[in-house]
Amino acid sequence: MNDALKTYLNGICWFLLSLVTSSINDVMSKYLGTRLHSFEVAFFRFFFSSIVLLPFVVYYGKNALKTSRPFVHVLRGLLLFFGMTSWTYGLTIAPVTTATVVSFAIPLFTLILAVFILNENIIWQRWVVTVVGFIGLVVMLKPHTKDFNPEILYLILAAISFAMLDIINKKFVVKESMLSMLFYSAIVTAMVSLPVAMQYWITPSSFELALLFVLGSSGSFILFFLLKAFSIVDATATAPYRYLELVISAIAAYFIFNEFPDKSTVHGAVIIIPATLFIIYSEKKSMSSKHESQ
């Protein structure tokens, strides 16, 4: 095995770790959300996340928390609150695999939001692919059938929130430290969640508290795994492997919740995955062209 292949496989392994952790997070969120309110799950998730980050704050010192855009951190925290509470609630309504496929559509929402917020010019091919991707969402969610549950749209609202976060990250927080982004967002989200969570409070069991701690910790681990992967291989090299999360989620959901993806989820995934792959590679090509022209 040559060095280039070893490096590539090393990067992919780190990326796969992020997928496994993300799938486990969804399974834990669904399990916790069946008894605890999504507001309470969000509070504990980000409360424990901020606690886990404290040793890093102490180690790197107050300079790591310096920020020139406090308002942006507040906005990110509000979007995280809205996104994670909607996502957790949606997971209690829909199968884990359905939620996973919805997450694949986030680049579609990001593309549309980028037009209005960043004033980006989008080539017509991307618009066509975006429409195709949304057709895939319709195929999966089946809004035209009697089996449609409107509450599943909470997953769509969450996806839009996460797309907004991507836009904010792209526009505002380039010069912010990763630690400040994580820590301030966790603090804001926990503070916003607590008053609402108190209205629906159910004291967690010891086991639930342990899961909530793991949930709060693993969010930072996902980011670490992703950054590690992207430091070794190009982000577009990992794109095809992103969709292995559907397989991982399906296996976990089957053994824990006895869920199995229905035909509409599979059909929707078959449409959405190629659409988002095209957008990812198109974005990469566009960025490369801009870089070469500078």
Curated annotation (Swiss-Prot):
Species in which this protein is naturally found: Rickettsia prowazekii (strain Madrid E)
Gene name, Swiss-Prot/TrEMBL: sam
Location(s), subcellular: Cell inner membrane
GO CC entries: plasma membrane
GO BP of this protein: amino acid transport
All residue ranges annotated as the EamA domain in the record: 22-141, 160-280
Main location, first listed in the record: membrane
Coiled coil: none
Residues annotated as signal peptide: none
Record keyword Membrane present: yes
Family: Belongs to the drug/metabolite transporter (DMT) superfamily. 10 TMS drug/metabolite exporter (DME) (TC 2.A.7.3) family.
Name recorded for this polypeptide: S-adenosylmethionine uptake transporter
Listed transmembrane segments: 4-24, 41-61, 74-91, 98-118, 121-141, 148-168, 178-198, 207-227, 237-257, 260-280
UniProt membrane topology term: Multi-pass membrane protein
Notes on how activity is controlled: Transport is inhibited by S-adenosylethionine and to a lesser extent by S-adenosylhomocysteine. Unlike eukaryotic transporters is not inhibited by sinfungin. Also inhibited by 2.4-dinitrophenol, suggesting transport is an energy-dependent process.
Function: Transports S-adenosylmethionine.
Domain of life: Bacteria
Keywords: Amino-acid transport, Cell inner membrane, Cell membrane, Membrane, Repeat, Transmembrane, Transmembrane helix, Transport
